[in-house]
Amino acid sequence: MKIAVVAGPAPGHAFPAASLATALQGRGHEVLVVTGVSWLPALERAGLPAEHLPLLKADPRDAIFGFRLYGRAAEQARPLADQLTAAGVEAIVSDTLTVAGAFAADLMGVPWVELIPHPLQDYSVGLPAPGAGLQRGRNPITKGRDAMLRAMHRKGLRQGASERAEARSGLGLTDGERMPNGRLVATLPGMEIARPDWPANTVIVGPMEWDPAEWTVGNKDVPLPPGDAPLVFVSASTAPTGATGLLEASLVACEMLGLRLVSTQFDTHDGPLPEWASVGPGRQAPALAAAAVVVAGGGHGMLAKALIRGLPQLVIPGGGEQFDNARRLKRAGAAIPILPMRLSTAKATTAVARLVGDPRYRLAAERLGATARHLGPDYAARMVERFLDPAQRIRERPVRSRIAA
């Protein structure tokens, strides 16, 4: 079967799409990755046929969330459908925020599967509003808060449904929308919060790693600093809202504590560095394999990579889902979050010292990582095959949360 995997250019969405495409290709499918032009060279070097997602140029209307999600998707959908039809695509896997893929599937009349590269953010009658990272209310005040947040979320859902219907109408799609054959939640089961209304045809498939640095030309690795002191891995956030100052605060903390530091970046680092620090472009996996602690912004990609390896984290969330992720990790005992406006070298130093010195953080991270031991890209690819086979029915996957709701 020829399957297109469609995702926008943001690393947190493009990389899981590439990982899934690699697994589908490994299972004998013909794949086509459609994403931002900046990733095409790495995808092609990785042996993945790739084309650019149409009409990605910045638009002033992007400031309006409804347009950014649905209006732009409506403009992209028809040229995307023509592009995929010409390529002989028989099914689509579409990133959850790249709605153009879903619209294109409707226009083409082909089945599609939704890829969600983070914990499920669906409305639930048993949880506060998704994305807030709040614990379920335990008393009349917090239960009232939850009810108010759910009401606000329902209002937002109604508005979103109206905007989506309007966008579809502009494409001539006035009949009932073709829902996805299934949904893949690419997170660790331990990162999910148990809910009483887990949606049907939605399965947790585990994180899906893909690193473009694996396919760069020349040296692929940042050299590790000499010595045997614990190594702190610092990841610059790739999210538009990512916090700044992570590297600077981490350098001071490591100097104070006598630790080593390594940080992988997309670009070379300007300026002098002490001998116990190494910063530059390179693959993340070798550096993570030697690390004791991760400092990151709380984006799901790095969060999952750290947990899979049992690494505790200092999280400085910059916005969006990062706050939710940071709070979930804190409740699980696997991270120490610091809000960006409260970040200081003193707080960073104290947090890193605790993460390195207290084994409970690492044990908590290992417990979370173990929940995805048998999951990952190949499992996700098998689920895509099952979702696209009408003779098979996917049963809901039970969620055994390790995070207090």
Model-derived segments and spans:
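A donor-sugar binding/catalytic signature common to diverse glycosyltransferases
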Residues: I92-D95, P281-R328
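Conserved nucleotide-sugar donor-interacting segment of glycosyltransferase catalytic cores
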Residues: G71-K143, G190-E192
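A short, glycine/small-residue-rich beta-strand->loop->alpha-helix junction that serves as a flexible
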Residues: V6-S19, T241
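C-terminal amphipathic helix plus adjacent low-complexity
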Residues: E177, K347-A405
